[in-house]
């Protein structure tokens, strides 16, 4: 009887661990795997969008945008939505209402995993760092509305200068990202100025954009910032 007791105890302990693993650990592992997989899938699609614009559609989109510069952002936003839809992302609404207002791209609202993606133009003039900061703020607000911890900011760079973006992640891994209020915001820069226009500017110094610029507009000074 004294021998049987530790054997029974060991069996019960193993059963308890097995139950704990099945009920607690396995769902956690499944969730983390699904989340990482979903982020990787979205980033893959957005990387394809960057290449498509830079390699094939840069001039055409720019011409459309400049035909009515006040609606330039709408041109690129519509193009992004169309591309995401063609890549299999369910997007029933182009701008869906949330508690914070309207998000540029909120897809799969009928599922438990909506995609929150903002798009902003950066031209170094009227649409500068403060404009990008508003995009980060909107992305974080919409992510919070939908209970998400991941958001994406697509930056249409029309400045002709490289953007040195802040990064809380691995500097060797694309794209850079920042963590704001428990939301990870991926920063997707697209070189959208036609190459002929960019070449006339030579090789200007990169635009240094800090995390403070994106989350605290009071740190930004000077015209065109």
Model-derived regions, located:
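Active-site metal-binding core of divalent-cation-utilizing nuclease and nuclease-like domains
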Residues: 86-113
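Hydrophobic/aromatic beta-strand patches that form the interior of the parallel beta-sheet core
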Residues: 115-117, 152-154, 186-188
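Short acidic, glycine/tyrosine-flanked loop/strand segments centered on an H-E-D-like triad
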Residues: 1-9, 116, 123
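Interdomain/boundary linker segments immediately adjacent to catalytic/signaling cores
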Residues: 3-70
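Conserved catalytic cores of phosphodiester-cleaving nucleases, focusing on short active-site segments
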Residues: 80, 105-107, 115-124, 142
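Acidic-basic catalytic patches of nuclease active cores, encompassing PD-(D/E)XK
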Residues: 52-94
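Domain-level recognition of nuclease-like catalytic cores that cleave nucleotide substrates
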Residues: 156-225
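Catalytic cores of nucleic-acid endonucleases
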Residues: 121-162
């Amino acid at each position: 009887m004294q021998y049987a007791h530790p054997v029974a105890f060991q069996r019960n302990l193993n059963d308890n661990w097995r139950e704990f693993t099945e009920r607690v650990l396995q769902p956690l592992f499944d969730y983390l795997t699904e989340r990482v997989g979903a982020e990787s899938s979205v980033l893959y699609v957005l990387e394809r969008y960057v290449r498509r614009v830079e390699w094939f559609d840069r001039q055409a989109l720019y011409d459309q945008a400049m035909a009515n510069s006040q609606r330039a952002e709408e041109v690129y936003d519509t193009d992004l939505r169309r591309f995401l839809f063609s890549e299999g992302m369910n997007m029933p609404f182009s701008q869906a209402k949330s508690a914070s207002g309207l998000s540029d791209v909120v897809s799969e609202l009928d599922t438990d995993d909506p995609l929150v993606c903002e798009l902003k133009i950066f031209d170094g003039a009227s649409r500068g760092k403060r404009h990008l900061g508003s995009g980060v703020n909107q992305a974080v607000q919409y992510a919070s509305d939908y209970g998400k911890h991941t958001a994406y900011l697509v930056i249409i760079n029309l400045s002709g200068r490289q953007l040195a973006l802040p990064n809380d992640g691995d500097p060797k891994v694309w794209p850079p990202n920042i963590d704001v209020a428990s939301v990870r915001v991926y920063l997707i820069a697209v070189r959208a100025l036609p190459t002929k226009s960019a070449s006339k500017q030579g090789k200007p110094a990169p635009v240094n954009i800090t995390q403070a610029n994106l989350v605290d507009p009071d740190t930004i000074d000077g015209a065109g910032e």
